[in-house]
């Protein structure tokens, strides 16, 4: 296995993924040679290539150069992949993405952010306040952070901030100094089987905290709050209600931002002003404040960093805004996330919110279609596409019509089932009007609809403005 200090040559199979590309960027900063393959070119592969990585856009055993010392694979890569087969024939170590993250993370003072929702934004905010505070952390984030112009930050300080992935249990390989948990919900049931097992995994995650470390827990979530008594380490709580250690009061949301007064126990720390919408983002920022404050960063420094934050890619990302009509894309793919995103959309002053939802995975749809049916109350129009399988085989009787039926059953009048992205884009081109906020939702490729509509609006110049 290549040495962390002296570098080596690591090859990534599936390097274009958000998690894989972030690790590749960290290794490049540490002096590694990096190569990788991914059939699809994207912003991450282009950025890595510009930074010195060798990128192949097909899977081939020939991509495995003689000098490669280690091969990293994503969860989507099968054992039959020709590069994996070639690596095993050469007796090269083949490690999972989570294993490499754990190796990098456990070699530094680790800050891990876990939870069903909000962990990408919260981990980005933690990294930003630490950077502003002069701690120069490395950061591995599950989305594009505009302030880093990347999904990773190659800081050379003692800390590494990581978004901890609970979906397959790999977050249990991490041994954090600080573990921040945003919330716990019934998701990834294809791996865990039950909510009780998910809660048990988070208890195990807290047990992984290093001696002298801390658990920072969101008191807004009852399941997370239930972990307080289970922690063998010091517990710090944060929330908007009750008496947590860190509290945001007087929350006011307006337009594309919000503000709140921040307290640490009985001490007033100051005013927080955010330039991203949604009460959930005040809560995400509060978690980052708790982490930064525990590390000794002054509140004024953190407030400055948080006030400059413009969001993470695919988290209420504005694709078009000409002053009246907006096209926004969001990764939300769970009922709780959809409700929070629609609540944020409702505050920006649109005449009509048009939600386009692409369900993600048959298993998630099977377990949560009733909850999805109740999640769209703040949308004026709802369009549901076919399920994005994410590698899953279809389940008998599980389809998008289950969701549209539930939405209609909740009393919603304008609900449309449009199977394909192409049909959806054609529909929106005809029906989009000034004052609309069109919101694409899902973890698959529904963003293509938003991007296509933004390009159409720009090309047609229906209203003045330039697409973003």
Curated annotation (Swiss-Prot):
Any one of the GO CC terms: cytoplasm
Annotated Gene3D superfamilies: Mur ligase, C-terminal domain (3.90.190.20), Mur-like, catalytic domain (3.40.1190.10), NAD(P)-binding Rossmann-like Domain (3.40.50.720)
Keyword line: ATP-binding, Cell cycle, Cell division, Cell shape, Cell wall biogenesis/degradation, Cytoplasm, Ligase, Nucleotide-binding, Peptidoglycan synthesis
Name by which UniProt lists this protein: UDP-N-acetylmuramate--L-alanine ligase
Record family assignment: Belongs to the MurCDEF family.
Catalytic activity: UDP-N-acetyl-alpha-D-muramate + L-alanine + ATP = UDP-N-acetyl-alpha-D-muramoyl-L-alanine + ADP + phosphate + H(+)
EC numbers on record: 6.3.2.8
Pfam families: Mur_ligase, Mur_ligase_C, Mur_ligase_M
Subcellular location: Cytoplasm
GO molecular function annotations of the record: ATP binding; UDP-N-acetylmuramate-L-alanine ligase activity
KW ATP-binding (keyword) present: yes
């Amino acid at each position: 296995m290549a040495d962390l200090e002296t570098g080596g040559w690591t090859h990534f199979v599936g390097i274009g993924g958000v998690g894989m590309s972030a690790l590749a960027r960290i290794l490049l900063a540490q002096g590694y040679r990096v190569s990788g393959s991914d059939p699809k070119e994207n912003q991450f592969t282009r950025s890595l290539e510009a930074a010195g990585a060798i990128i192949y856009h097909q899977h081939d055993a020939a991509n495995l150069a003689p000098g490669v010392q280690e091969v990293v694979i994503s969860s989507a890569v099968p054992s039959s992949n020709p590069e994996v087969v070639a690596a095993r024939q050469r007796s090269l170590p083949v490690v999972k993405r989570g294993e490499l993250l754990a190796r990098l993370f456990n070699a530094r003072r680790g800050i891990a952010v876990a939870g069903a929702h909000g962990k990408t934004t919260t981990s980005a905010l933690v990294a930003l306040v630490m950077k502003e505070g002069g701690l120069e952390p490395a950061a591995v984030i599950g989305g594009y952070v505009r302030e880093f112009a990347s999904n990773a930050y190659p800081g050379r300080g003692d800390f590494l901030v990581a978004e901890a992935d609970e979906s397959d249990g790999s977050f249990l390989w991490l041994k954090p100094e600080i573990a921040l948990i945003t919330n716990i919900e019934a998701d990834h049931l294809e791996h865990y089987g039950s909510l009780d097992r998910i809660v048990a995994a988070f208890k195990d995650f807290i047990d992984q905290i290093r001696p002298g470390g801390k658990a920072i827990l969101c008191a807004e979530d009852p399941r997370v709050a239930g972990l307080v008594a289970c922690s063998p380490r010091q517990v710090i709580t944060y929330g908007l209600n009750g008496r947590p250690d860190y509290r945001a009061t007087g929350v006011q949301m307006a337009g594309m931002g919000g503000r709140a007064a921040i307290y640490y126990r009985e001490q007033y720390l100051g005013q927080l002003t955010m330039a991203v919408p949604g009460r959930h983002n005040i809560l995400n920022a509060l978690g980052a404040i708790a982490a930064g404050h525990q590390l000794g960063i002054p509140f004024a420094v953190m407030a400055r960093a948080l006030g400059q934050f413009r969001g993470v890619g695919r988290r209420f990302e504005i694709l078009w805004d000409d002053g009246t009509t907006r096209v926004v894309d969001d990764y939300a793919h769970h009922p709780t996330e959809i409700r929070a995103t629609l609540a944020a959309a409702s505050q920006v002053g649109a005449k009509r919110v048009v939600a386009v939802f692409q369900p993600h995975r048959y298993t998630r749809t099977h377990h949560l279609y009733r909850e999805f049916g109740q999640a769209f109350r703040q949308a004026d129009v709802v369009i549901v596409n076919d399920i994005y399988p994410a590698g899953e085989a279809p389940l008998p009787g599980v389809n998008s019509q289950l969701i549209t039926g539930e939405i209609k059953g909740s009393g919603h009048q304008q609900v449309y089932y449009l199977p394909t992205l192409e049909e959806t884009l054609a529909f929106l081109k005809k029906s989009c009007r000034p004052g609309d906020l069109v919101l694409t939702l899902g973890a698959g490729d529904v963003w293509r609809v938003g991007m296509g509509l933004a390009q159409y609006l720009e090309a047609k110049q229906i209203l003045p403005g330039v697409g973003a």
